[in-house]
Amino acid sequence: MTNYFDSPFKGKLLSEQVKNPNIKVGRYSYYSGYYHGHSFDDCARYLFPDRDDVDKLIIGSFCSIGSGASFIMAGNQGHRYDWASSFPFFYMQEEPAFSSALDAFQKAGNTVIGNDVWIGSEAMVMPGIKIGHGAVIGSRSLVTKDVEPYAIVGGNPAKKIKKRFTDEEISLLLEMEWWNWSLEKIKAAMPMLCSSNIVGLHKYWLEFAV
């Protein structure tokens, strides 16, 4: 099998590799998949590309996604754990005994990844999950619940380890929405974006926001 990636040290922009129309991506988000060899489309499991009535995978800008991360789509995939049997009889109706089975499929809603999110290698995000801006998902975490902005989570199931910043600093970051700035403004702010000076970054933003 030919590796889609040339090097483990350089990912590829999602905008350059995603072909599934049910995956929506922002600018500069990338997938670094060298160790698994496939493009990002294969990270979105069970997501039909030829249907528009399915849950979508929506990824913001400036997201970093590690090799082998996966996003489980297709709702409950035809399994109802609240029924007597979770078996998907409906999808095997060529068997006469199953011909009266009901369709158990249920949507979960769109899976939404915010901006500036870092998802570690082989993390798994379950259907319908919302991950807030600036969150960090630890490698091999199983994300079964929504993740708040700027939280660091890890484990199986994933639990909050800590917040990246103080509540005040998080509020400033969410107010600024730096990921929506023009490249010119990002260039000027780069020394602060590459630092922990959230207050200074906010002051810079106030100068051009007014």
Swiss-Prot record:
EC number of the protein: 2.3.1.28
GO biological process annotation, one example: response to antibiotic
Reactions that this protein is recorded to catalyse: chloramphenicol + acetyl-CoA = chloramphenicol 3-acetate + CoA
One matching Pfam family: Hexapep
Domain of life the protein comes from: Bacteria
Keyword DNA-binding: no
GO molecular function: chloramphenicol O-acetyltransferase activity
Keywords tagged on the record: Acyltransferase, Antibiotic resistance, Plasmid, Repeat, Transferase
Family under the similarity heading: Belongs to the transferase hexapeptide repeat family.
Function according to Swiss-Prot or TrEMBL: This enzyme is an effector of chloramphenicol resistance in bacteria.
PANTHER family: ACETYLTRANSFERASE, CHLORAMPHENICOL ACETYLTRANSFERASE
Protein name: Chloramphenicol acetyltransferase
Organism: Klebsiella aerogenes (Enterobacter aerogenes)
